[in-house]
Amino acid sequence: MPWTAPSKRSILRIKINGHKRTGRRSIVNIASFLSPKEEVTFLRDDMTIRQGLEKLKRYGYTAVPVIDAEDRYVGVVSEGDFLWNILSHNSELDTITMKSLEKLSVRDIIQSGKIRPVCIDTNMEELLGQAQMQNFVPVIDDRNVFIGIITRSEIIKYFIKKQIEVAEKQI
């Protein structure tokens, strides 16, 4: 039997049956999905454009979180942000040199607010809303300190596992 996506009704059932309840709402601790900062590729906002590009290339990501010297979340930068910034500062493509990539920092190309972080105590509904729009969701604490990311794939794996558990109980 081929796998089909869970319906909204079965997701609600999973959430209610799979977690402790308070009143009418189920609580999911989103920390269980967290990839901690120590395991996440990120850039510092004071890195040069060249350093940022090298790190993106080395790890093969198309977008990564950016933090400042105090580990506070600043935003996300993508390969597209790098490309558009390089092109806007170099009118001729053949004038792009490594030296020109040393003049600007990552903080100069960040589009703040493009990807909003969630707080570690955020509810599952808000996390799901953010994860629908991007491959990862940055997670911060109550002081805006970056503590890691939650990937959309981890959330999907969780719901698939819960859907299978529900299906097995019905057999």
Label each PLM-derived region with a short phrase.
Residues 78, 83-102:
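Helix-adjacent hinge/juxtasegments
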